[in-house]
């Protein structure tokens, strides 16, 4: 019964981790919580029973077991096959340089058939799958590469890219952290980890955290409301709004006057921005930080 409790504890731990992810609806998260409570009741296990924890997470145990049963024994690969597989890998690499990703996948697949215990072939195929937008297949290939070589940092890094593309930011952070543990000086892993962590913060909070811009706080800010009211009392703005309403209900065309209205609107907007800068500069700085943050994320993703 002790071994069964270890297994159930691992399952409960996995379900609890899943219930805390934002990929599920509130109803689905509630169902996971019910499942956890049922298992704890039936097997008389509580979160305090940490002595039942195993060293390896359930997902890693499953991946390792699955991949061991999914690939052929190493003894089935003969030297001739290994040599041919390496040639196919080189062909696949050339296809990648030429951006012929489908052909690259085909070459790596043939290499795997000849030498199924080479982690590099799975990892390279994962890169090609990601280029084709086949992120789920890329993750599977990375998992197989890791099962063969658990210290293969590049496999963790490429799995992080695929997970990020699927908006699985929490798992992506874990993958990048493992990649950095194995290759601490890799700037690409550091950059991509920061991006994944930032994305995770953004999706974890409705109003955003860190450098994210809180529009609700801006709109509800008393100083902002006061300045907006002052702007609407500006005679130029009132005249502009009156002219716009006249045109909207079929009045005379704007003509040259329309250009004057536009100039007045720009001038009023500039005055409003100056008032915010003078009376509440932290709001302007928050907006600037938000724009800088978005620009950094876009640039980093494009060069990952």
From Swiss-Prot:
Entries under Pfam families matching the protein: SGTA_dimer (PF16546), TPR_1 (PF00515), TPR_11 (PF13414)
Modified residues (N6-acetyllysine): 131
GO biological process, one term: protein heterooligomerization
Entry keyword Nucleotide-binding: no
Residues with PTM Phosphoserine: 293, 295, 297
Domain of life from the UniProt record: Eukaryota
One Gene Ontology molecular-function label: identical protein binding
InterPro entries from the UniProt entry: SGT (IPR047150), SGTA_dimer (IPR032374), TPR-like_helical_dom_sf (IPR011990), TPR_rpt (IPR019734)
GO CC terms in record: membrane; TRC complex
SMART domains: TPR
Subunit structure: Homooligomerize.
Protein name listed in UniProt: Small glutamine-rich tetratricopeptide repeat-containing protein beta
Species this chain originates from: Homo sapiens (Human)
High-level lineage: Eukaryota, Metazoa, Chordata, Craniata, Vertebrata
Gene that encodes it: SGTB
